[in-house]
């Protein structure tokens, strides 16, 4: 009798053990599936308008958006073009741009609240005119581009620092009235031309470095830069064309030095329009 009872209890215990083990396995499997299930954090499609092929952001329509990560969104990360006026007058404060981005249209962010812009593209980006004019950007690291468009950052009063990528031309008024900018370092950028009034009225800029590749400096390029006392021009194969002598007029009594390659000092001093600044021109200190 005892043997039968003991055998029955052992059988019951084994069944209970198998049941609990199976239940635990099923629970763990469900939990794992739930954990691994992808979470869709995409921005509601009603917040924006895309082109039919999904490659152009035509317009941002949500008026309350302040932060946007386009690269983190499965649809917006495919965008390669931001159309003209897309974020104009919006409350957007920060944006992380997609890796595929190739073009930003005219006035795309003009008069918006944007203060932080992050570029992720490895390819050159084409900028439209005045795309970031009158915004709150404080510092920016620019991607490689053929040209920094006319008036691109004009009136960005809070812009203190710019890190330039490769660029061939800086357009007219590109940084005009960026009154917080403290220095302009264009060394090793491959820059060929600076447009008219490109850095005019950058009132706090104390130093500017122009690369060996510079060939043309436009009229009033650095005019109204009251404290710009140190300008280095590294071009030595030929003296760059200075379109007007007023390129460096400060509007103040600041004592300014223009440093040029030691072997070309006299060439600079005697070149058209440069001769106006012959007393300020001196050799680069090695």
Question: Predicted segments — roles?
Answer:
Residues 274-277:
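Extracellular interaction modules
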Residues 46-52, 63-81, 90-103, 112-126, ...:
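Structural signature of tandem-repeat unit edges
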Residues 1-52:
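Bacterial Sec-dependent N-terminal signal peptides
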Residues 245-251, 272:
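A structural signal for leucine-rich repeat
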Residues 84-85, 105-108, 129-131, 149-152, ...:
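Consensus positions within tandem repeat domains that build extended binding/scaffold surfaces
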Residues 55-60:
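A short, structured beta-strand/loop element
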């Amino acid at each position: 009798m005892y043997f039968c009872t003991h055998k029955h209890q052992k059988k019951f215990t084994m069944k209970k053990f198998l049941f609990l083990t199976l239940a635990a396995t099923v629970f763990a499997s469900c939990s794992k599936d739930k954990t691994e299930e992808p979470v869709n954090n995409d921005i509601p499609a009603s917040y924006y308008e895309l082109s039919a092929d999904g490659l152009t952001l035509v317009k941002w329509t949500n008026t309350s958006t302040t932060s946007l990560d386009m690269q983190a969104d499965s649809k917006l990360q495919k965008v390669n073009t931001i159309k003209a006026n897309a974020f104009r007058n919006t409350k957007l404060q920060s944006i992380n741009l997609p890796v595929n981005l190739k073009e930003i249209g005219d006035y795309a962010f003009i008069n918006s609240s944007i203060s932080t812009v992050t570029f992720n593209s490895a390819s050159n980006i084409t900028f439209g005119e005045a795309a970031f004019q009158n915004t709150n950007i404080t510092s920016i690291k620019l991607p490689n581009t053929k040209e920094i468009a006319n008036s691109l950052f004009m009136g960005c009063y809070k812009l203190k620092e710019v890190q330039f990528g490769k660029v061939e031309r800086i357009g007219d008024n590109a940084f005009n009235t960026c009154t917080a900018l403290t220095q302009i370092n264009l060394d090793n950028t491959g820059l060929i031309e600076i447009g008219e009034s490109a850095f005019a009225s950058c009132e706090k800029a104390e130093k500017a470095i122009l690369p060996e590749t510079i060939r043309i400096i436009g009229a009033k390029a650095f005019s109204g830069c009251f404290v710009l006392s140190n300008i280095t021009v590294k071009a030595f194969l030929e003296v760059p064309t200075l379109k007007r002598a007023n390129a460096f007029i400060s509007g103040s009594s600041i004592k300014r030095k223009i440093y040029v390659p030691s072997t070309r000092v006299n060439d600079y001093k005697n070149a058209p329009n440069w001769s106006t600044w012959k007393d300020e021109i001196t050799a680069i200190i090695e």
